[in-house]
């Protein structure tokens, strides 16, 4: 008799995704981040659901309701900080997942990659709107500054901003709709993640060598289930340590001051995971130019399959490309640091140089390095 997991319509899908899936035998821990992102998303949806039970999306009571969650709700402080720091863990996993894709040439699976970039945009939008909800100083001014960027769009810009605000400034209407969008978007992210997985399983996973692994596959369970469980335990340990020992480490102290439209904080800055993009935005003196650079800093990922000039898929055997890749990582860390600094000398010029280097590396230097390596290896 055939096993039920191979015949039952629903179990069959689970089986072909998580149990009998043929996986390459040599994928490293860099391939763990897909499952870790899934865990992060589930965790965020669950903690978010419980927070939504006690939160009120009204300008008069939003800040107080978050205080109430932390002080009066059973383990409310834990749920709130799990959610806030869970977002940080989510982005750490996202950046490492994207970095893995760049290093090992996973972007050659174009449908999977493009949906991944859409997922990145969706998660960034969700995180931005979530940051507005506590209605602290940085929530209010962050929302004002970032939504205001849309006014740089010619002709329709101002109307668009006022339409998003639901008035002439960030106010009750803005907070209410941001809460609605923040609630619905994670479910859209979950659906997109399902499509992401669907396209991945059409081709099978890539592997560190970038070569076809069809001749050497192993079942996902038990080999990679146990490996994913180890990754999950490390993730939970890291998140628990952050939440229980220094929950405010990655937050902004200004967000413990209730939103005040009459008082601007000295340094308006987003959460740490947006700082690299914020630095690129600020490095261009022109408003529209800055907005375009900001969008293109993420959108450039969509061009990766077109910029791939190497005859090898992975960077595993390409030392020049490896050096440029790690230079790109260092550059992104520099941009993250600059994004959190005030707009003054020498930070402005460092930010401008780092922004130029970012686009130069991706659009010019890495494709040229690949061509040089093709010649050196006589391919």
UniProtKB/Swiss-Prot annotation:
A GO CC term attached to the entry: mitochondrial inner membrane
So where does this one cross the membrane?
33-53, 77-98, 113-133, 178-198, 226-246, 288-308, 320-340, 347-367
For this chain, one GO molecular function annotation is: metal ion binding
Tell me the InterPro entries matching this sequence. Answer: Cyt_b/b6_C (IPR005798), Cyt_b/b6_C_sf (IPR036150), Cyt_b/b6_N (IPR005797), Cytb/b6-like_sf (IPR027387), Cytochrome_b (IPR030689), Cytochrome_b_C_euk/bac (IPR048260), Cytochrome_b_N_euk/bac (IPR048259), Di-haem_cyt_TM (IPR016174)
Q: Which cofactor does it need?
A: heme b
**Its family?**
Belongs to the cytochrome b family.
UniProt-recorded name of the protein: Cytochrome b
Q: Supply the source organism for this entry.
A: Scapanus townsendii (Townsend's mole)
Gene this protein is translated from: MT-CYB
């Amino acid at each position: 008799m055939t096993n039920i997991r191979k015949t039952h319509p629903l179990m069959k899908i689970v089986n072909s995704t998580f149990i009998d899936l043929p996986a390459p035998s040599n994928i490293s821990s860099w391939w763990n981040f897909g499952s870790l992102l899934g865990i992060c998303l589930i965790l965020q949806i669950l903690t978010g659901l419980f927070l939504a039970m006690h939160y009120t999306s009204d300008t008069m009571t939003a800040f107080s309701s978050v205080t109430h969650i932390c002080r009066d709700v059973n383990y409310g402080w834990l749920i709130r900080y799990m959610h806030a720091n869970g977002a940080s863990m989510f982005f750490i996993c996202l950046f490492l997942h994207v970095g893995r894709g760049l290093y090992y040439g996973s972007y050659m699976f174009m449908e999977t990659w493009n949906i991944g970039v859409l997922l990145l945009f969706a998660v960034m939008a969700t995180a931005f709107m979530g940051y507005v909800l506590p209605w602290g100083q940085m929530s209010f001014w962050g929302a004002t500054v970032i939504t205001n960027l849309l006014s740089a769009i010619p002709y329709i810009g101002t109307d668009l901003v006022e339409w998003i605000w639901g008035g002439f400034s960030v106010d009750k209407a803005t907070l209410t709709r941001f809460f609605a969008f923040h609630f619905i978007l994670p479910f859209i992210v979950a659906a997109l993640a399902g499509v992401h997985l669907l396209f991945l399983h059409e081709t099978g996973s890539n592997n560190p060598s970038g070569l076809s692994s069809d001749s050497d596959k192993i079942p996902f369970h038990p080999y990679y289930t146990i490996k994913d469980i180890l990754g999950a335990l490390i993730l939970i340990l890291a998140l628990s340590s952050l939440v229980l020992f220094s929950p405010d480490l990655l937050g902004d102290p200004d967000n413990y001051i209730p939103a005040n439209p009459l008082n601007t904080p000295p340094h308006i800055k987003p959460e740490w995971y947006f700082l690299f993009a914020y630095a690129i935005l600020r490095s261009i003196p022109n408003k529209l130019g800055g907005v375009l650079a900001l969008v293109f800093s993420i959108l450039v990922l969509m061009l990766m399959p077109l910029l791939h000039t190497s005859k090898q898929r992975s960077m595993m055997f390409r030392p020049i490309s490896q050096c440029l890749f790690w230079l790109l990582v260092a550059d992104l860390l520099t941009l993250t640091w600059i994004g959190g600094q005030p707009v003054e000398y020498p930070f402005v010029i460092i930010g401008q140089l780092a922004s130029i280097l970012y686009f130069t590396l991706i659009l010019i230097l890495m494709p040229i390095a690949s061509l040089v390596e093709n010649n050196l290896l006589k391919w």
